[in-house]
Amino acid sequence: VCYFREQSRKRTSLYSTGLRSGGGVSLQDFQKDKSPENHHYNYLTSFRKWEDAFGIDALVPRIYDRDRLDEGDIRRDFLKHALPEVDPEALAYAAQEANMSLSHDEARLFQAVNSARGKRIGRVQDHLPGVLNKLVSDLPGLDRSVEINDPRQPDMYAAFDASNRAFFKRYFGQDTNLFTAPKQVATDPEETPKYRLSDHADLMHS
């Protein structure tokens, strides 16, 4: 069972993970050279290699989108398609969510703090990503309802449209792009959030 996420959303998710791990690159500079020639993002190219190795009948491709997952839960969805003999109701699903995507405000704060710390080296920096994750998660005044805004998303969706159509035709039997198109965002990705970063200078220089 293999899950595929629309490429521009995948890039945004990787950006969020990178920030949580201490990365400080700006959103506009993050993976700005990705194109259908990139193996990691071209699902038609990469999945053909899986087909060559295991055979097409052994593959179960799925779209990674909560609205398309069984009961909106990837665990249940995986069980349904990989282990249908397992009763999903016999399992416990109480677990704390991990590595949640950052909101737009959170990402801006992470990027500012991480870039300010960028030149620090040595063991003293090893614990900082974890500390920052805790501090930002507890910080009041952040708007956590708005996802990271990347105005490049529609262009990336369009760039991969042809290869995605071919991918879905071959592996889903549908001659269309089944990925939901991202909306054009109105917010400048580098726009300062509602709070001032200077209000949290203690995070940037501590």
Q: Where are the language model's segments positioned?
A:
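Anion-recognition interface
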Residues: V1-S206
